[in-house]
């Protein structure tokens, strides 16, 4: 396992982008890194934030869906403020029929019910770019995920 600060990770991402990589390529690399850790799970819930970490989760959801896993994607955040990569992968997921719920406060119980029935919940809410206190629906989701005792949890970037 490698450990890096958020500053180091931002610099690494920027160096790759400067070399000509597209953000979608970085997202695919991130989801490829998580994919082997999901091989033993069939029922998978992925909760995605509005940024590139959410895009990592969306990309992973697509790959798992194509491997015939039972995937449920939950996305939150202002639809007008999604990262470019997040918006791209939402479109890709919708195109192939991956079930996506665009959450608001009324969908929390639906998420909880699905999460409790899952083999694993994948947290793709926030990445190393998080620089503020978690609040609103995200805070509620973090608390609910922390209360899942009989379900495995995998966090992409930061738990």
Task: Describe the residue ranges of each PLM region.
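Glycine-rich phosphate/dinucleotide-binding loop and adjoining beta-alpha-beta core of small-molecule
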Residues: 1-4, 41-159
């Amino acid at each position: 396992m490698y450990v890096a600060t958020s500053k180091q990770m931002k610099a690494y991402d920027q160096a790759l982008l400067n070399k000509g990589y597209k953000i979608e390529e970085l997202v695919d690399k991130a989801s490829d890194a998580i994919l082997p850790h999901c091989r033993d799970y069939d029922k998978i819930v992925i909760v995605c934030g509005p940024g590139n970490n959410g895009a990592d989760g969306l990309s992973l959801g697509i790959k798992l869906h194509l491997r015939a896993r039972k995937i449920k994607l939950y996305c939150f955040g202002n639809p007008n403020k999604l990262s470019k990569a997040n918006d791209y992968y939402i479109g890709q997921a919708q195109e192939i029929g991956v079930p996506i719920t665009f959450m608001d406060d009324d969908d929390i119980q639906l998420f909880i019910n699905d999460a409790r029935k899952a083999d694993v919940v994948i947290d793709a809410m926030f990445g190393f770019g998080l620089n503020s206190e978690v609040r609103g629906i995200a805070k509620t989701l973090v608390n609910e995920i922390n209360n899942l005792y009989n379900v495995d949890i995998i966090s992409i970037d930061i738990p």
